[in-house]
Amino acid sequence: IVGGMEATPHSWPHQVA
């Protein structure tokens, strides 16, 4: 997960890896 908020699953718009 590369989004910065890997601790929050619902914070990923497209980063569901």
UniProtKB/Swiss-Prot annotation:
Serine protease with chymotryptic, collagenolytic and SANA activities. It is found in: Secreted, Extracellular space. This is Collagenolytic protease. One of its GO terms (biological process) is proteolysis. Optimum pH is 7-8. It catalyses: Hydrolysis of proteins, with broad specificity for peptide bonds. Native collagen is cleaved about 75% of the length of the molecule from the N-terminus. Low activity on small molecule substrates of both trypsin and chymotrypsin. Its EC number is 3.4.21.32. One of its GO terms (molecular function) is serine-type peptidase activity. Keywords: Collagen degradation, Hydrolase, Protease, Secreted, Serine protease. One of its GO terms (cellular component) is extracellular region. It comes from the Eukaryota. Belongs to the peptidase S1 family. Monomer. Optimum temperature is 30 degrees Celsius. Residues 1-17 form the Peptidase S1 domain.
